[in-house]
């Protein structure tokens, strides 16, 4: 598979996962609030980077600064933007560079926190001049403009992120898989172009599939399954390598067309992915099953006046086969044909990403139904 970058987010507010020999308190049990004491040694980092390099994969280590740094502040007794904090971060970056000798870039974060004047500029200068590496930051920053004095590449993480001229930008704004439905959002990834373009260029470097395991789950396997990790990564990689995508997800959304070119292209991707699920990935935890053969009828939304228990004609109908339209309060309510195992009536990012309903609103009730074939009479759970 043509996946050529592993972005390793090594620090967060809950835990610090990178061994810093000069500051062992960062990885002490008492200073982590999730999975205390679990971290990667520098030897493990070197080993993983070498393993990745043999397979054509570049590792991008990230030490997020100065935000997402609760563990740092707790362990060190001072914040990252203090004089002591800046000195400590430079020592930490020295160790990061030694643990990742092949990494052309070091990611220094910068997001979701108010930046002091000169902080990112000083850290960027240090990485460039003292470590000989290039710098990646998140985009946007909270209170500063991203510019060449702060980064050599940016990673767009929200809808307000815009590409910065004269440097490469990674677009992962709508590729946060921890928000995703297993089925509908895979369609969105595959249908969408990357940053409104058919092909990459000097300013659009590609995309990254980001699995933020902010919510604690029972096992690491659950992270892979619940993020539909394999399918999402391979859909992202294919779109990044071959380009295309009829339109951006901000226009096309996650709705799978019932027929046509986009449907045929996705069906072909699905066929190839399910082949790998059955063969080269047969031992991996993959929840995805074929969805291009799943069809629904979905009603126009009925106004419920804020009462979600209110009953409408589809529930009152006793026919074996439901009709394709209903009369309620002297008004005609039609149904629409839909394809796919997951249908967003309103997307989690509904103000930006279109869904099945063009204008979803509060206090509405809609009905969706499909038919399930069973080769024998049996009872199943729902």
Task: State where each predicted segment sits.
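Short beta-strands within extracellular/lumenal beta-sheet-rich domains
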Residues: 360-373
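Aromatic-lined ligand-binding clefts that engage carbohydrates, nucleic acids, or primary amines
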Residues: 373-374, 378-382
């Amino acid at each position: 598979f043509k996946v050529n970058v592993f972005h390793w987010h090594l620090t967060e507010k809950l835990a610090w996962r990178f061994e810093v020999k000069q500051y062992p308190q960062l990885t002490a049990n008492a200073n982590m609030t999730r999975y205390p004491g679990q971290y990667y040694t520098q030897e493990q980092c070197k080993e993983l980077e070498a393993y990745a390099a043999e397979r054509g994969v570049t590792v991008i280590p990230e030490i997020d600064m100065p935000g997402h740094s609760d563990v740092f502040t707790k362990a060190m007794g001072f914040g990252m933007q203090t004089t002591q904090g800046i000195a400590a971060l430079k020592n930490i970056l020295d160790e990061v560079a030694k643990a990742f000798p092949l990494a052309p870039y070091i990611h220094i974060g910068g997001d979701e926190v108010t930046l002091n004047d000169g902080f990112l500029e000083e850290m960027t200068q240090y990485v460039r001049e003292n470590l000989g590496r290039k710098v990646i930051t998140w985009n946007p920053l909270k209170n500063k403009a991203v510019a060449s004095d702060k980064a050599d590449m940016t990673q767009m993480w929200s809808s307000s992120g815009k590409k910065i001229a004269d440097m490469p930008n990674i677009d992962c704004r709508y590729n946060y898989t921890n928000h995703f439905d297993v089925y509908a959002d895979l369609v969105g990834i595959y249908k969408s172009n990357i940053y409104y373009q058919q092909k990459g260029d000097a300013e659009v470097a590609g995309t990254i599939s980001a699995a933020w395991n902010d919510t604690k789950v029972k096992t690491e396997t659950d992270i892979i399954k619940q993020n539909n990790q394999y399918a999402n990564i391979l859909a992202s990689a294919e779109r990044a390598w071959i380009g295309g995508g009829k339109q951006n997800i901000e226009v096309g959304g996650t709705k799978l067309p019932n027929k046509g070119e986009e449907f045929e292209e996705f069906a072909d991707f699905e066929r190839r992915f399910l082949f790998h699920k059955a063969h080269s990935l047969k031992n991996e935890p993959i929840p995805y099953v074929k969805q291009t053969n799943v069809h629904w009828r979905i009603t126009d939304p009925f106004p419920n006046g804020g009462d979600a228990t209110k009953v409408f004609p589809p529930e009152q109908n006793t026919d074996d086969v439901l009709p394709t339209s209903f009369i309620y309060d002297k008004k005609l309510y039609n149904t629409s044909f839909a394809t796919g195992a997951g249908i967003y009536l309103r997307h989690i990012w509904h103000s930006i990403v279109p869904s099945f309903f063009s204008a979803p609103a509060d206090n509405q009730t809609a009905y969706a139904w499909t038919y399930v074939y069973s080769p024998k009479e049996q009872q199943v759970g729902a």
